[in-house]
Amino acid sequence: MERHFVFIATYLLIFHLVQAQNQTGFISVDCGLSLLESPYDAPQTGLTYTSDADLVASGKTGRLAKEFEPLVDKPTLTLRYFPEGVRNCYNLNVTSDTNYLIKATFVYGNYDGLNVGPNFNLYLGPNLWTTVSSNDTIEEIILVTRSNSLQVCLVKTGISIPFINMLELRPMKKNMYVTQSGSLKYLFRGYISNSSTRIRFPDDVYDRKWYPLFDDSWTQVTTNLKVNTSITYELPQSVMAKAATPIKANDTLNITWTVEPPTTQFYSYVHIAEIQALRANETREFNVTLNGEYTFGPFSPIPLKTASIVDLSPGQCDGGRCILQVVKTLKSTLPPLLNAIEAFTVIDFPQMETNENDVAGIKNVQGTYGLSRISWQGDPCVPKQLLWDGLNCKNSDISTPPIITSLDLSSSGLTGIITQAIKNLTHLQILDLSDNNLTGEVPEFLADIKSLLVINLSGNNLSGSVPPSLLQKKGMKLNVEGNPHILCTTGSCVKKKEDGHKKKSVIVPVVASIASIAVLIGALVLFLILRKKRSPKVEGPPPSYMQASDGRLPRSSEPAIVTKNRRFSYSQVVIMTNNFQRILGKGGFGMVYHGFVNGTEQVAVKILSHSSSQGYKQFKAEVELLLRVHHKNLVGLVGYCDEGDNLALIYEYMANGDLKEHMSGTRNRFILNWGTRLKIVIESAQGLEYLHNGCKPPMVHRDVKTTNILLNEHFEAKLADFGLSRSFLIEGETHVSTVVAGTPGYLDPEYHRTNWLTEKSDVYSFGILLLEIITNRHVIDQSREKPHIGEWVGVMLTKGDIQSIMDPSLNEDYDSGSVWKAVELAMSCLNHSSARRPTMSQVVIELNECLASENARGGASRDMESKSSIEVSLTFGTEVSPNAR
C-alpha cells in the first residue's frame, strides 16, 4: 500500500503564541452536578466545569461509591444515569464547520450498588460512535461539525442503564488532524517517558491527554532546554522535552498496537525532535517502517525543533497487528530516537441529520405544546429504529437529509391554538391533530404547505370558518368533524373533485349538532340504566360458561368485563403498535407487540390468535384477575381490547424480557451472577406469596416458570401470564378440583394425579424454577440418566456433588452456604407430599437468608459477567495503551 507523509518543522522564525490558560470555546460539563451548584475550577487543570442540567431533558443524578472517590478527579465523582427511555441525548451549541476534540468519560464506580458493568451505545447525532462496555473508559473523537448543534446520545441496548460522568469539547484548528474522509476515533496517544505523569491542560492547549510510554530496552533522554514545538499540532513542551533511544545502538525502536476488526484503517502521527547535543562526528539518521515496509526517511531530526511525520492517507495492517519501527541507517552513528506518537482509527458518519428546517419546526411544535415524550430526543428521523413516536420520515439516501412527512399528535392533550410552527414542516403530507382540546380558528397557513394530503382536526374545540383556500385545495382530505363551533360562513363548505362532481368536505349545521348531542345524551342514560341492572360484581364468583366445540366461547353468552382500566378499540391497538410493527415474542395466547400509549408510555400488547389453543375464557380470566390484584412483583395491566373477534391485553412494558432468555444467553452476552439470580427469585416469590395470601379469595397461578418471570428496565422481576390462574371461591377452602393445566416438567405430580389444585402446586413449580437458576439446565433433558431436573439433582446430592449441580458459568463465584441452602429449599419444594412443602411465605424468608449469606462475603463478584473474554490493559481512568517493544 502506498503511504504518503508530510514533514513539518518549526525552524521558522514565527513561533505560535501558546495561551495556556485560554479556554475559549471549551465546553466542560460535569454530568450529574446539581444546577444549584456554581461552576468550579478543577484543581488539577484549572478547567471550569458546569452542570449538565440545562443540556439534557432526562436522567437522574448519581455519585460514585465512596471507595472509588479517592481514585478519581472531582469532575468524575458525579454522573447522570438514564433508567427511562431508549435514547437520551445531550444538546450542545457548537460552531459549524469546526474541528472539535470530543471526550466522553464513563466511570461506573458502582454508583448504584449493583455491580452491574455498563454495555450501551454512544451516538453522535444519528450515527453510532462507539459501544461503552468498560467500567472505566474515556471515549475520544476528532470531527468537523456539520451544523451549530451537536447531539451526544446514550442508547440503551440491553440490561445495563446508560450513564456518563463527564463531557468535554475542545475546538481545534482546521489544519490539525486532517483526513481524506471520516472522523478520527482515538486509539492511543503517548509520550516517551519512564515516569507515571500524565500530561494535559494547561500544558496541552487543546487538553489532549498524553500517557507515558516506555520499555525496558530503551534509554530515557531528556533536556531542560526549550524545544520549539510544532506550529500545526502545538505539542506540549513537557512532551517534546523527553525521548528514548534503544539501549543497543543497532536495535530498532518499536511501537506495537492492534486494531479491530483487522481491516480497520488508521492514521498515525509521529513527533520527533533532537534533544541531545551531538558532537561534530556524530550523526543520527533513521527510516520509519510499518510492518516491515518503508514509509518515510531517511530523516535526521533537527536540534530542538519538532517535526511531525503524518499520514496523508489512511494505513492498514495485515491481521490487525501493527508494528511501527524506527530503524537506524548505515550512515548513522547514533541509535534512532522518538519523542511521542498518536494513532486514530477512521470512523465514517454517513447518515445525514434530518432536514434542518424540519428539525427546527418539530422542536418548535414540541416547545409550544410542552410535549415531554421520552422518545423525542436526538434526531427525529434517524436512525430508523429510534424514530420519534408519532412521526414518519422519508430517508431515501443516507447522503441526503431525511424529511418529516407525517405528524400524528392525536390524543396528546394539546391545548391552545394550532401553532404556526407547523408551517416550517414544509414536507408534511399527513397532519393528525385529532382528539385534543385545540381552540381558535383553522389557520390558513395549512393551505400553504403544498405537500399536505391529509389534515385531521376532528374532535377538538375549533371555531370560526374553514379557510376557502383549504376547501379549494385539490387532492387534499380535510376532517373537522367533532368541532361544534366551526361554521361555513364563506359560501358552501364544498370542494370540487377534479372530475367536477361536488363532494361535501365539511358540514356542521347547528341543528344537526343539537340533534346529535340529544341522541348521545339519550344513549348514555340508557347505557347507565342497563349497566346498573346487568353489571356483575368484580369480586363475585365467575359465571358459568357454555363451551363451544372449538374451545372458544360463543360470544353471545360471554358477559362483559367490568373494569376501571382503560378499554381500547381495535383501531387504537393498531395505532399504538404502529400497525403491529415490532414483535416482542410469541406465546400460546398469540403474538406480543411493542407499543406506546399516550405517545410516552411503553406497553406490551398481547393479541389473541384465532388459532390459539387458549380462548376467550383465559383472556377474561386474566383481565379479571389483574383488575383486582396490585403488587410490585406482578405485571400490571394497562388496558384491554374486546371488540368482535379482536382480543388484546395491554401490559406494562418489561424492557429486559423474561428470565429464560437471560439464563440461556439468547437475550445478550451477560451471565447473571448468583446474587442477581437470588434477587430475581425473591421478587418472583413475593409475587406468588401475594397471590396466595394477599388476595381474597386466594389465587393459584398454575403456570410458574422462567418464561413467565419478566424483568423491567431496572431488572426487577414480575410474575406474568395469569390465563391459567384459579381462585378458591369459598373462604377456608384448601383445594379446588380442576382439569389439569400447566407446563410439563413444572407440573405438580400430586395435582396431576388427583386434579386437586392447591397453593402448594405453585410451590412445586417454583422449586423447579429455583433449580433452573441454580443449575442453568433444561427442566427435561432426555440425554441425562434422570431426564427430569428434580430427579437428576436428587441423584447428584446423594453423591455430595454440588459442583456438578451448579451452573459452570458462575465459575464458583458464590457463597457455598448460600448455594446449599437454596438447593435444599428447592428440593423441599419438590416434596411429593404437598403438605410437607413450605409455604411461599417460608420460601421468601429462606431465600432472603440465602441472599444475606451471599452479600456477607464482601461483594467480591459482579452481578453480570461477560461470556466473551476480551484481553485489554486498563488502568483506572485511562484508555487502552499500545505496547512498547
Curated annotation (Swiss-Prot):
Top-level taxon in the UniProt lineage: Eukaryota
Any one of the GO CC terms: membrane
Glycosites: 22, 93, 135, 194, 228, 250, 254, 281, 287, 424, 437, 456, 461
Residues of the Protein kinase domain: 578-851
Pfam families: LRR_8, Malectin_like, Pkinase
Location(s), subcellular: Membrane
Gene Ontology MF annotations: ATP binding; protein serine kinase activity; protein serine/threonine kinase activity
Membrane topology (Cytoplasmic): 531-885
Membrane topology listed for this record: Single-pass type I membrane protein
Family matches, as InterPro entries: Kinase-like_dom_sf, Leu-rich_rpt, LRR_dom_sf, Malectin-like_Carb-bd_dom, Prot_kinase_dom, Protein_kinase_ATP_BS, Ser/Thr_kinase_AS
PROSITE patterns per the UniProt record, alphabetical: PROTEIN_KINASE_ATP, PROTEIN_KINASE_DOM, PROTEIN_KINASE_ST
Protein's UniProt name: Probable LRR receptor-like serine/threonine-protein kinase At1g51820
